[in-house]
């Protein structure tokens, strides 16, 4: 038995599919399947109930998966401790980002991070909040950049910046010539939203409910770009995070307006595991990002108005 065997087992437990598990481990399906069988032979116990339709773990298999996750987390800590003995800001770093942050934040910070930390090898992973936090907990990710939510409170949260939400409306909407929109004016309106699983959906829904608005249930988008295109087509209005808003007040059939009284905002933060030996690395990374984004939204909102 070795660490790689445990990684195969955990991957199979996560994906419940041999091919997808093999792909995630960057090996062939026969290789992964063969190693699982060898592990069973070595332990003298069946870990899987083999059926043609799905992967089912035996009780012994489930217990071993739980222990394997613990072992892999400890291995991650050992690697971090070893890394700490060298240069703090060097070597590989796996960063997770949510889809409503990654595409819009990365162009602002990646050039700066490469210049500030040239020896840092960054690997970027995009997924929804619950998936990123699970991967962070298992040790697959080193840190995560997301909108801080209740689920992230179990980790160390380092706030980076507060991001305003802006109203996106189609160009012939009655509000198109306004400079801003009080949140109270949204009362009775129905707004387009992202599908379930996006933390931005829950946050935007909260802002809407407080203002007396509701969700347009005829359509749920998979991405911010889909929302934007639906607004441009005149299918509705929505709230978009400021990083996803262009510098122009109006572009491609969409008008972007600041929301006021109150201004809806979400806090973007960097999250990492408690007790990580590489705390200094994550804190330095957060400080660099915070400095890079300082004042960004003040100037962006002035341009929009």
Language-model regions: role of each:
Residues 10-28, 52:
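Short helix-boundary/capping micro-motifs
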Residues 18-23, 30, 37, 133, ...:
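Residues within helix-turn-helix
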Residues 40-57:
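A short LG(V/I)-centered, amphipathic sequence patch enriched
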Residues 90-153, 221-223:
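Central regulatory/effector-binding core of bacterial HTH transcription factors
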Residues 128-141, 146-147, 195-257:
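Hydrophobic hinge/microswitch elements
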Residues 152-191:
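Flexible hinge/capping segments at coil-to-helix
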Residues 175, 190-211, 278-287, 292-302:
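Secondary-structure junction motif
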Residues 242-254, 261-305:
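C-terminal effector-binding regulatory domain of bacterial HTH transcription factors
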């Amino acid at each position: 038995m070795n660490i790689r065997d445990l990684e195969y087992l955990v991957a199979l437990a996560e994906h419940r599919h041999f091919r997808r598990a093999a792909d995630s481990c960057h090996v062939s399906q026969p290789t992964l399947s063969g190693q699982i069988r060898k592990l069973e032979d070595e332990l003298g116990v069946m870990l899987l109930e083999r059926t043609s339709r799905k992967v089912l773990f035996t009780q012994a298999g489930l217990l071993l998966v739980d222990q394997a996750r613990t072992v892999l987390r400890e291995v991650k800590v050992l690697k971090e401790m070893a890394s700490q003995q060298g240069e703090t800001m060097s070597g590989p770093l796996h960063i997770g980002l949510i889809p409503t942050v990654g595409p819009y934040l990365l162009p602002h910070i990646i050039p700066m991070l490469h210049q500030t930390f040239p020896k840092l090898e960054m690997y970027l992973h995009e997924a929804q909040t619950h998936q990123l936090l699970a991967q962070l907990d298992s040790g697959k990710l080193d840190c995560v950049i997301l909108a801080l939510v209740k689920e992230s409170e179990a980790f160390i949260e380092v706030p980076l910046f507060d991001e305003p939400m802006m109203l996106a409306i189609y160009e012939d909407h009655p509000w198109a010539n306004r400079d801003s929109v009080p949140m109270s004016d949204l009362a009775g309106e129905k707004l387009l939203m992202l599908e379930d699983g996006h933390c931005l959906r829950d946050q935007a829904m909260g802002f809407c409910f407080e203002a007396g608005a509701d969700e347009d249930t005829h359509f749920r988008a998979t991405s911010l770009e889909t929302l934007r295109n639906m607004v441009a087509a005149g299918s509705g209005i929505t709230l978009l995070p400021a990083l996803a808003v262009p510098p122009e007040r109006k572009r491609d059939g969409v008008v972007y307006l600041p929301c006021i009284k109150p201004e809806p905002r979400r806090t973007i933060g960097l999250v990492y595991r408690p007790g990580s030996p590489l705390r200094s690395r994550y804190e330095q990374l957060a400080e660099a990002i915070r400095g890079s984004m300082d004042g960004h939204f003040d100037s962006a909102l002035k341009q929009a108005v």
